[in-house]
């Protein structure tokens, strides 16, 4: 597959090499140009003028909402080596750094949620989005029913890139969102605490500490790692794949979206093409 490179300056990302466990899908909340996204990260500074170290390893271009230009549609640009890292999640939790270190981020150029005014659709900067680039979810997701559509070329490029990264970094693509979308393996009935711990470990569930469960037969209190994993399993049964997820927040392996760790984000939105792409990973 064709992956272009437009590397950020050295100080814009961390050069520490970290084993990868997860892949996170984002959208940029911006225009179709991936090179412009990367250039904006170069300019992005703290209030005191320091480097922010905010980026994803990859950005995938889209289709212009102004003139329909497709020169960048599905174009993948790598802006730092995927084995290295930068901040892209922004979680207000003690494990934020670890989750960023252990993940590979992919941004898709897309404006995100849209507002309908009459028969027209507008993004958050009041730019008009053509009707043929709009998805009507049929229900509100995070307060919005209409979203800028991810293009077919973006979906294909995202899938190909995720599959490649899964192979390169031994990330199980059947974990994470695919488990939620396809439905989890059901826990056998009648298991005691030790049996539940063994089963949860076999299925890849982890405790709130980000580790496999200790198989000691002790349930512990309501905030124990065993109960954290059991509640994660119950959460998976509800099938809310694009909502906050306990396993994602703990650092469980697999493919996730930004919405799985941030309640204030809309990336990715649950568009049918995205759902089918994630469900098909590994096929």
Regions found by a protein language model. Name each.
Residues 2-173:
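Active-site-adjacent loop/helix surface patches within enzyme catalytic domains
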């Amino acid at each position: 597959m064709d992956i272009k490179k437009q590397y950020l300056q050295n100080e814009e990302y961390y050069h520490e090499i970290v084993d990868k466990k997860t892949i996170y899908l984002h959208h940029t909340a911006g225009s179709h140009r991936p090179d412009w996204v990367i250039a904006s990260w170069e300019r992005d500074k703290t209030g005191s003028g320091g480097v922010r170290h905010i980026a994803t390893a990859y950005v995938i271009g889209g289709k212009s909402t102004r003139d329909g230009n497709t020169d960048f549609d599905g174009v993948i640009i790598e802006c730092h080596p995927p084995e290295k890292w930068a901040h892209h999640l922004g979680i207000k939790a003690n494990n934020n750094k670890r989750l960023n270190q252990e993940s590979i981020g992919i941004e898709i150029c897309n404006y995100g949620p849209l507002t309908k005014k009459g028969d027209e659709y507008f993004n958050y900067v009041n730019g008009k989005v053509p009707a043929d680039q709009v998805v009507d979810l049929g229900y509100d997701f995070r307060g919005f029913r209409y979203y800028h559509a991810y293009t077919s070329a973006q979906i294909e490029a995202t899938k190909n890139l995720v599959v490649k990264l899964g192979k390169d970094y031994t990330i199980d693509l059947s974990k994470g969102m695919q488990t939620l979308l396809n439905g989890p393996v059901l826990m056998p009935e009648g298991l005691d605490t030790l049996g539940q711990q063994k089963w949860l470990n076999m299925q890849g569930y982890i405790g709130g500490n980000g580790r496999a469960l200790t198989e000691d037969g002790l349930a512990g209190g309501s905030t124990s790692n065993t109960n954290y994993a059991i509640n994660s399993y119950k959460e998976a049964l509800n099938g809310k794949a694009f909502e906050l997820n306990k396993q994602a927040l703990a650092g469980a392996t697999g493919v996730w979206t930004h919405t799985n760790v941030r309640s204030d984000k809309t990336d990715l939105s649950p568009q049918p093409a995205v759902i089918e792409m994630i469900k098909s990973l590994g096929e």
